[in-house]
Amino acid sequence: MKSIVAIVGRPNVGKSTLFNRIVGERRAIVDDMPGVTRDRNYAVVERYDKPFILVDTGGFEPVTEDRMLQQMREQSLLAMEEADVILFLMDAKQGLTPADNEVASMLRRVDKPVFYVVNKVDGEKVENEAAEFYALGIDNMHTISAAHNRGIRDLLDEIMALLPDEPLPGEDEVTNIAVVGRPNVGKSSLVNRLLGFERVVANPVAGTTRDSVDTFFTCNKKRYCLIDTAGIRRKGKTSQKLEKYSVVDALKSIERADVALIVLNAEDGITEQDKHIAGYVYEAGRACVFVVNKWDTLEKDNKTIGKFVEQIQYEFKFLAFAPIVFVSARTGQRIHKVMEEAAEVAEQYSRRVTTSELNRVFKEAVEAHHAPLHHARRVKFYFATQVGVKPPTFAIFTNQPDGVLTPYQRYLGNRFRDAFGFKGTPFRLLFRGRERKTADGRERKLSKQ
């Protein structure tokens, strides 16, 4: 496991801005509304050849009656517990607050390195005012401006000095799994059930998860990163600026994923939004599993599952290869099947086929059904080879790449899927012209007809 560095502090002190500054890209949503980051947000960062996991947390309010703020406080406590190093961030412009004193008092009892960091120090006047934070009884304080990249390098240098020179043992390749779906279909509840503890703030209010939240975990000796995304609405439905950020972030999470768990609500059936979301997954070329949640709420007979499967396969013809799991995140019904299917489709997503086996199937397909003539010329095929994975990608060499029309491409694709399965994963066929040699031995590419 990599070392973990957690950023904690009151709401709206600039934790997400600092997180984004260190990561080097806009990963957490930044907005002036307190409580924007509700869950822990993870990113892998490497500096001086030392990789570590940076954690952004929701605002920490030591005493509050607000249920959401209480849940955010619990998430911050979990982050502090799992961290190797803690960055306690405060706000120079707001000054030292009673809540800061409460958090500092709690951190004094923590047996791990704590960096006391005062943010929003944008000038000499503010620098002088920041001296009041020494009243916390600390010996060393860092003054920074995350928004203007002031003092960040020195802070990072001190952090890196505390981290191991070599990655800790047990680092394996991580499979990224994005949990996607409409708002309030139970994505966060599903994540919490899969992980076995309340990793993500689960709340019945639609749109609770605003950021895409990463969680690293191990299942059957394999490493995974589970990405809980904000609910994706259609463009016309995203009125608030913050919600638009969340939708964009969710789409980016699909791009980062190897596998997408497309969560459907059994109570609602299949909606147009569900089809749009599945379309995003298909266009991104990701492996996927349909997870039909809230299955416990339906009255069922021995034909209910069959009818639902038929409906999914009809509405999502373009993802007909995806397995379907019927679960209840609330009761835990069949939850174990989700990771079983996700692990299997992830393996298929990275699968390689031997060249000999590939060409045997390819030759049989071509001999069984020749490609139509193109511009009165016969389309000749030479050989096929696998050129990539995630998804599996095959190059097919022919005398007329443009002459292999869509119906014949589908035919070859169906023959490949019949032979190799590729459960839960798309694959790509690339048609390329083969190079020929001229009389003097030089190679030339076939001209396209």
Swiss-Prot record:
It comes from the Bacteria. Pfam families: KH_dom-like (PF14714), MMR_HSR1 (PF01926). CDD domains: EngA1, EngA2. The keyword Transcription does not apply. One of its GO terms (molecular function) is GTP binding. Transmembrane segments: none annotated. Residues 351-435 form the KH-like domain. PROSITE patterns: G_ENGA (PS51712). Keywords: GTP-binding, Nucleotide-binding, Repeat, Ribosome biogenesis. The keyword GTP-binding applies. Residues 3-167, 175-350 form the EngA-type G domain. This is GTPase Der. It comes from Trichlorobacter lovleyi (strain ATCC BAA-1151 / DSM 17278 / SZ).
